[in-house]
Each structure stands twice: as structure tokens, then as C-alpha cells.
Amino acid sequence: MLPPLARIHSPADTIPVRHLHQSIGKSKKPITVVRWTPEGRRLLTGGHTGEFMLWNGTAFNFETVMDVRGQKGDIKYWRPNFNNVETIDDAHHDAVRDLAWSPSDTKFLSASDDTTLKIFDFTARTADTVLTGHNWDVKSCDWHPTKGLLVSGSKDHQVKFWDPRTARCLTTLHSHKNTVTTTRFSRVNSNLLATSSRDQTARVFDLRMMRDICILRGHEKPISSLTWHPIHSSLISTGSEDGSLYHYLLDEPNLPSGQVPTIAPYDSPDPANTPAQVIYPAHRIQYAHSATIWSLDWHPLGHILASGSKDNFTRFWSRARPGETSYMKDRFHIGEEAAEAQGTWSRGFGRRQMREEEEQEAQDEAESLVDQKNTTAQSLPGIQIAPPGLGSLQTGSGSLLPGIGAPQPAPQAGMSASMPQMDPGRLAAILSQQNPSQPQNFPSATGIPGFPMPPAMSGTPPLNIDLAELQKQLLSQGISPQNFASLAASLGSAGLPGLQSSTPDNTYRR
């Protein structure tokens, strides 16, 4: 299938009608935000209890989780490896509901339940400007992708535009009749702004006319989330409090039968006074979630839509394959009872699928894709997480290193499992002719996962030697074993080669 960019004039082919995958975090709490990373390799989700979870964007498997709960009004900076590098304490006096970056990425805008918006300098970590004017909680904000223009939506039903240089409110829109839940500028057509509200409608505004040109109807419950497609400027997706997911095409009204069509303001001789055109969904996924959809976000390539919900699930949606129509009978379109009656879904299969997902999550954790604790200890330079197999390493302690005091790992492919034998007497004779006080080239019993074998041992299996017999042979030839420090002791005192022994015990954490 071609990517959406290859069919730029056919947005209908990009509508994500098919359920692709679902994921649930280990805390099993509501998902309040979902965001793809800029390159689209991972998806970051935020939980109701203050947890961030990272999901693989290809296999959709769980990677890691970080508990970031803190005080209301705090803003925290995080690195991609989940190191908390800075915290702006008391950035607001109440919960922060939304953030938006400036086009230059040097400043960001925050919206809070304390009725204010603030512009922060990212480097200085200080509030440059405070925007006041809303009379109730500010639920959403956005920064225009190319211009010095801000927008905010509030519980006072108002949409306000702001000048970031003067902190002055430029104008206020009163089109909505309930809380404004989302305000988003289009990244493709910078003249358009979309808003959603608890009045069960979404609206599209033209900034050149400073008025609404489209009203998106069809939802039976308040709209809680909205997103633009990153490539098609006419495709908008909305999520509702009843768990429904609707997709709208701004150039296709899709009116119900019997309803009189309305004309678009652009096609009217008097665009300023023509009522906004009413648009109905081009596609409905009525049972996308079983509770409120709090957040929606498109993959940067525009082929996968992620949704986060109060039902604790993060779900992924994609286009249907050419000729595929079976998705219309799945449980997300017709409901669980109807799907079960038609044989397209069974409750037993759903429970089994849940168990398999939980088992997969447990397996991911067992493979070192585990919780990252919020600690102040820094990782080793150049090593963001512990190398595989070193999760329990503690310098200077009696903890087991891989291959020391533990069973030998499985041999590499193409290598015999049996180790070559050597006569201890012959080895003692060889050692007696050499300087026994230089063990620096003495190879380890096994390679440490994540680190290459020493050059002298590349491709060569370690020797299987009876150390007790070797000690007897050395003593019989007058060689004192005390000159040979044990490998375990040398590792315990000097640490791993190339790493300082002063590494704190909590460097490697699970």
C-alpha cells in the first residue's frame, strides 16, 4: 500500500477504519494523552496516575514505564531515556492541561486550570509572559506553526487568540455553548483552526475571516478530543465521551437523508454572513472504546492513528487493505453483542487476547524492558540504560556477574557445546616458563553481554580446566598461586574494563 503522501488528493483512502492493535499499561489506569515521537518510532502515553509509558511504534510492544507523578502545576523536562533533567516548580497554581511549542522550539505555552496561560523560555526555565483573560479553567492551547499567534480554549466556552509579544488578547470567539476541550491549528493549511467542545460539535475557523466555516455534527455525547491529519488538510478525527471515533472530510458534507444541504461560505457571494456549512462523519467507529477518548494523535507519516481512553486502552487504527470490508462487522463498528451474534468476535477470544497481551508485557519486562525509577543518579556516559544482562551488577559487591558463579550460557551458533580439554600438567609447565605476575591478558570465562570478547579470544571458546588439579601442579613445581589474583576478585576491585570502579551501586537500575 502506498503511503498517504502518494495519494495527496484522495483523503478518503487514508481514513483509519480498521483496528490494528491495542495495548494496555501495567498500571491499567486511564490514558489521558498519546503522542508519537517526531520520527514515529515510538509512542508515548501518559496515564491518569502520573505514569509515562513508551511503546514500540512498529511491533506495538511495551518498552518502558516511568512514574512521574508530582505536585499540581509543576512542569518537568525529560530526556528520551526518561532522565528528569529539570523541574519548574509551581509553574502554575493548578493542574497543567496542555502544552504547545513555538515554531522555533525556544519557547513553549502552557494552559492551566488556574485560568491563565504562560509563555516559558525553554533554556532559562522561566515564565516570560502571563496571559490572563479567561474566567474559568483553560483546557487547551496551541501555537501557530508559522506565525506569532496563540489560541486557547476554556471552560468558559470561549476561544481566544493572543499576541505572544504583547500578551494581548486579539479577539474572542463565542461559537461554542459549552467547555472547549481542544484547539488545534492545521499544520498543512495554516489558515485553519479546529476546535471541539462538550456541546457535541467541532468547528473549523478560517483565520482570514475570523469566523467558523464548518460545523462538524454527529456525536451524541460531548467531544473530548480532536486531531488534524498530518498530510490531508481536509481530514479531521474526533473522539467522544461515549468512546466513539468519527472521521470527517471537510469537502464531503455526508448529510443524513432528508436534511437540506448547506452551502460553504467560500461558494457564497457573501462569505462573511453565510452560515457555516454542516458536515457529518465520512466514517464512524461507534464502539472504538468503551469510555471517553481523551487523546488522539497521528503517526507523522499519516498511516496510523493512536487513541488513548478512559477504558485504560491505547488503540491503533489504520487504513483498510484494498477490497477489505470485514472490518465493518467487527466489534468496534457494530458492538460486542452484534459481533458475537454474527460470529466475528467471541468473549472468550477477547479474554484470551487480554491474557496474551499481559503475558507479552511480562516477557518484555523480563527482557530488560522494565520500569525506570525516578532517581537522581546519572547513567554512565554514552550508556542510557543498563546493557542486557547487567541489570543486577553492583560494583564491589558479591553479586553475580554473567558467567561467574552461574551456569555457562548457551554456546554461540556453530560452536560446539563441549569445551576442549587440556592436561593440567602441560599448562603448569607452560606457565612455569612465563612471568606469572602479568595476568592482564588472562581471558574471562565468558563474554559479558553487550561487550565484545577480548581480541585474543575472538571466536575461541574458553578452556574447561580443573582448577584444583592445576593448583596441585603449580605447587609441585614451586609456583605460588598467590601471584595469580582470582578473576572474580579482579573484577570486583577494578570494575569492568574501561569503566571506573567508582560507579555508584544504583547506576544500573531496573
Curated annotation (Swiss-Prot):
Keywords annotated in UniProt: Chromosome partition, mRNA processing, Nucleus, Repeat, WD repeat
Superkingdom of the organism of origin: Eukaryota
Keyword Repeat assigned: yes
GO CC annotations on file: chromatin; mRNA cleavage and polyadenylation specificity factor complex
Primary location recorded for the protein, binned into one broad class: nucleus
GO biological process: chromosome segregation; co-transcriptional mRNA 3'-end processing, cleavage and polyadenylation pathway
InterPro entries documented for this protein: Pfs2-like (IPR045245), WD40/YVTN_repeat-like_dom_sf (IPR015943), WD40_repeat_dom_sf (IPR036322), WD40_rpt (IPR001680)
WD repeats: 26-65, 91-130, 133-172, 175-215, 218-258, 288-327
Location of this chain's protein in the cell: Nucleus
Pfam family, one: WD40
Signal sequence bounds: none
Function: Required for 3'-end cleavage and polyadenylation of pre-mRNAs. Also involved in chromosome segregation where it has a role in chromosome attachment to the mitotic spindle.
Name of the featured protein: Polyadenylation factor subunit 2
Taxonomic placement: Eukaryota, Fungi, Dikarya, Ascomycota, Pezizomycotina
